[in-house]
């Protein structure tokens, strides 16, 4: 019996991609139906440990130096001396998983440079409903304790259930990484371990952004807004974000490390993460004043300017408003005017939540969201940015329809007919290769779809389209970041989004997410795999010149037929005489495929009429090859191969194109023999499929015997 371990890595990747797509269609990967990371089922593993009376030890993230990291966190580094892995019960007498009085100030950073993760975890504590989506309840060091815990983390479009054992790195009986200030709670330390397992090691956590952590804890889309150059609809954007229960943070950026944790004259802390939690309009001195509520999660130091707890402005508003909004406590919560907010803080960060994160909440409105997973593959779908027009068209393409305009703005004199759209492009798995490849420079371009291309789906726009039409919008900049996004306001209509790397020929996987205020439709814009039945060639005696006819008779056997070997010699002599065409000749494999294509009686040979048909086809294929060989090099590049195969009658979608290029190109170069080998293989596979799909359903059912016969023959 064939074992999965016997299958090559390339085949495993293809099988994994197909299986992943099938599971996604069944709803696996949503929060309520998360993937079991590393195929580890928490309930099953815990039950097995309880049955055996053992404590769980995770084989995929062992209590070994390699789980901590390399270089500065390697086993020989200064930081990692005298490190021991201990379970919480070995550290303190009565450990708790999580208590009800958690707050951001309970979480302390260790020796690891992951303050960004610390801030994201702290933000979760301000929103218990989100926290308990990540940290499932009913976990304990007492009832059914087996040394195993689990967490739910979002990664690149899918929720994962990540299992860890509770062995944690310690020195002198104290945790060396994230820990609780009062030492009793261990949920934050174990959550950090689950995140480290997901990306490979603790060391891979060094360096990041708070928004990256918030995205992986919520599945939301994050955006940064510099407040020195805010968008024109800044106040509306804030109101909409709060209506949609978005998580928001603000800060005063620093340019020098010496400024971190220093205070302004109004008691705001530089380099400090604040939360934006509310927005209210109050009547003050006969006009409407917009106030913003800010929370300092890390301490009790508060703003002491206008509208602070003890400010005189509160004496001039109605008593009802004062009672409703003002709470004179040093609890980190305070109000300030919108103008003071804009002039004192320099950065606003927003994490827009997906509808599934809000499904049990009270909210006024929510985003409509869709996401697509895709890839850029060298030689097929990695076309680079618009600076590379010869290959830009080959990038994945996505169409979005925006039929409904936003609701009118209450505070605006002119109500534009626009659709708000948040587009976010994220590259996958960059932390997993932290010691190797780094982040690629990525971005996207948006084109308005002209009328003649609207309502089309089974099409991949080619080079001519992008040379003719201008883009309608674009990401702020192509940047080497995990994610780039743009908050756009577009007229109703259809648009095409082209995500790409800046340079062509860069391999990567990506996630494209689109958030809209109103209903929208999005879909992948791609060719359907299709075989066009071209008109069969009619041949006459004039299609072969006298020399070629004589050569056939010399090569043929007594029955007037040529086999694969004779055809090989015959074709190589004849193609050598073709004018303005370079070729190294045909391989035996291609000759075998040609015979399979035209051999009607199953003899494995071709008689004269069949050869005449073949020769006419070959001349047509050579013309297609020359037409697509734009630089007249005698070869096609892998992008031209897709166009040539299409001209020959076969359309391929991006996934099939990626496989074909990987199989039949040599460093993105395709000679005539490889082109024909690929085309004939595709044509044979289409013929087999269509003959089996008698009801034209687009799918067939094969047993192992039929599968092996067809694939081995093809």
Curated annotation (Swiss-Prot):
Keywords: Calcium, Cytoplasmic vesicle, Hydrolase, Metal-binding, Protease, Repeat, Thiol protease. GO terms for molecular function: calcium ion binding; calcium-dependent cysteine-type endopeptidase activity. Its EC number is 3.4.22.-. The keyword Repressor does not apply. It comes from the Eukaryota. Gene3D superfamilies: 2.60.120.380, Cysteine proteinases (3.90.70.10), EF-hand (1.10.238.10). Its main location: cytoplasm. SMART domains: calpain_III, CysPc, EFh. GO terms for biological process: proteolysis. Residues 528-543 are annotated as: Linker. It is found in: Cytoplasmic vesicle, Secretory vesicle, Acrosome. Residues 355-527 are annotated as: Domain III. GO terms for cellular component: acrosomal vesicle. The active site is at residues 115, 272, 296. Residues 55-354 form the Calpain catalytic domain. PANTHER family: CALPAIN (PTHR10183), CALPAIN-11 (PTHR10183:SF322). This is Calpain-11.
